[in-house]
Amino acid sequence: MIAISVSAQTGRIGGKIIDKKTGEELIGVSVQIEGTSIGAATDFEGKFLINNVSAGTYNIVVSYISYKKKVLSGIEVKAKETAILNISLEEATKELNEIVIRGEVKKESANAVLIQQRNSVSVASGVSADLIKKTPDRTTADVIKRVSGASIQDNKFAVVRGLGDRYNMAFINGAPLASSESDRKAFSLDLIPAAVLDNMMIVKTATPDMPADFAGGFIQITTKDIPDEDQYTVGLSMGAHSLTTFKEGFSSQNASSTDWLGYDSKRGIPSGVMKTEEGRNATNSQLIDQTKLFDNNFKPTQESSIAPNVSFNMSGSKRFKSEHNEFGVLGAIAYSNNYRYTPFVVNEPPLSDEQRSMDFKTADYKTYNYSNYRRSVNLGGVLNLSMKLGKNNKFSFKNLYTQNGEDQTIKRDGIQYVNHAAPFVDQENKVFNDYLYQYQQSKMYTGQFTGEHFITASKIKVKYTLGYTAISRSLPDFKRLIYQADKQIGDTVYPRSIVQLNPDANAFTPNQTGRFSSQLQETSPSAKYEVSVPVKMFKKSEVKFGGFHQVRTRTFNARNFLFTYDNNNLDPSRYNVAGLQGPDSVFGASNIDSSLFFQRETTQGSDSYTASSRINAGFVMFDNKITNRFRMIWGARIEQFNQRVSSEAIGKKVDINKTVTDVLPSLNIIYELTENQNLRFSYSRTLSRPEFREFAPLAFYEVNYNSIIIGNDTLVRALIDNIDFKWEFFPSAAQTISINPFYKRFTNPVEMIVVPNPSFRNFSYQNASSAENIGVEIETRLLLIGLDKLAGTNIFKDMTLYGNLALINSQVNLTNSGAGLSKR
């Protein structure tokens, strides 16, 4: 045995071996300690593990038929630790000649990481587990901002290559994530704590084995896996926000005792409230009694001193091994509590064509100052199980549960320049003072069972994943209180009053005082399977075929309550007094009677719906290594998609049922210019489908937009043609420079449009005739050790410079909607 030092205690040597040219895992590679019979062979994932190695320093011999033998020197094994070797092997020019290459383990591991990127079938960027550990990132939404070409909207939705949530798709551990939003195709990435992630990749070009419903990025989230050795970790971090930490005056709703755990135990519609059908026929007396059942909780609470932001995580894993089999279990929990205050200003232009044509002094125009107070709590847990039977069979069962609670209070004040009458006010400029209270809670469970098998004789690989995701999102008691006063003239300010209390109110609208409650439930079982078969074609080839099936089922229910009055019994003198009262007392019990205020339920049939969709897909993909330098990955995917929405419009049932089948080809070409340069070309056709609410011809109030949104049953799915070029240069180990121009052509893209309304802003959806997205991404990763030679220091030896730049131009042609040409 060749060793520099040896002790009585033992460790392990493990890692993964891949083909240097293709990045493919190599099966059956011999890994031995030089001069001994101690060793192991790689399994069907290219992984190996040598147990019971005495602590010391060794030379490791790696050999495989038709590949150059490699000897790694200076491999240090420490007691009770695993030395990780990620190794690439190069094909021998003559199969029977032995060629020995000697290298150091540190360089070898760095090269293996870059080789995986260099030989990736698609253009992809990602974040590793090591980087995630070094950052203060709290959720997956924070992590994704570190990926080239990606950003986050509203602190939770992914934007990739300038394309929003509609054009991105998220998978976790190989299975799709259900949408967390009621009216859009989007997954709220802040639901998954960063502490439970192993890695995250964003694939930007399509291949036939990937779902077709994306054009920006295919987000692949992987939770923690079973490590090669037993591990137990605990992490705690604290942070400060300059506008909240240890500050007074933070506004929030009346919190429940469980808010700190991310769910509500207090808010919601009280027991005793009539069902919607009963409320529609209720008398004023019944409505008054019902209004008094609700808490008078319109006053924001104040905090004397806000605690720092805090994050905590803990994980543990255990591996059990017999002579031929392995079993592992990993558990992790993560918790975070975050406060944020955001002040901003909004200028809202006139809404109608008539108003926009007016002179500024006579047109409606609004300017608002916002104060947004937000507390967000995330709690998540992971339980992952894995089992390996022999070297050719592996099973895993991964589970993730998260719950998130977000308490948000928005205070808004400003001026509306008006030229038309409104109830109880004069035709002068108006000062607004509004309060919006929103507590949103979300719960998600997602589980994936995966099996992987390798048939030694034929070298066929089989992989399948059964997935299930369930999401619950509720808004138990969204409240809005709107005050309005005439503009101050000199030292005189007209009394404030509650704005627009409409005696004929029959729907929840953006400019009225009231409350709103909603509940969304969605489940999404799925199945994916694929078979990879080597074929004798060109220098080396493989054909992969398989299928994908997914069923989404959703229910959404909402109830609306508006404060109103009885026009025949209203006492104006009492109204003028009550209108001066603050949020704590304006809707107190003494003001709830027939001559003043009460709540009327204005829930419409269109405020609730049930929906489902079904995808059945199959694909075939060829991976041809035509020459040593030229590789082509090509094939096609067929998807049949059925979508159904059931709801109720005014006086009638609405039932939409549509089925579409698409054939979607793709081609990826990789040409190796030199040993350290690649040139890539990619073409693919993908698509984007309307979401449930978008193509249902219903009008509904959307809290997040504070607007009425109207669906459109004439919408069709959009087709997208994607073209990518990429030049990659790898100057040395752990360094890369890349330039990636891309172009996308959209046919019939679904766009949100403004529906003119003189009172408040409405939205709907329409297929534009076409759109284009063109841009370039530049990414660099450079070691700074060269600066030490210039400066005569050793300051930069462990420093790396990362940088990325994305220049993107998008243009949408809206001529078929009569809206002209719009650019963004």
Q: For the regions a protein language model found, what residue spans apply to each?
A:
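Signature of Gram-negative outer-membrane beta-barrel scaffolds
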Residues: 404-406, 509-518, 530-674
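Outer-membrane beta-barrel signature, preferentially recognizing the C-terminal barrel domain
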Residues: 426-450, 603-616, 687-746, 756-787
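Short loop/turn motifs that connect adjacent beta-strands in outer-membrane beta-barrel proteins
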Residues: 226-231, 321-328, 392, 456-461, ...
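Periplasmic N-terminal accessory/gating domains of Gram-negative outer-membrane beta-barrel systems
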Residues: 76, 105-159, 165, 174-192, ...
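Gram-negative outer-membrane beta-barrel transporters
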Residues: 742-745, 764-824
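Short, acidic Ser/Thr/Gly-rich low-complexity loop/linker segments typical of extracellular
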Residues: 36-47
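Short, acidic, small-residue-rich periplasmic hinge/interaction motif at the N-terminus
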Residues: 18-22, 29-34, 63-65, 78-133, ...
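Transmembrane beta-barrel wall of Gram-negative outer-membrane proteins
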Residues: 289, 293-410, 667
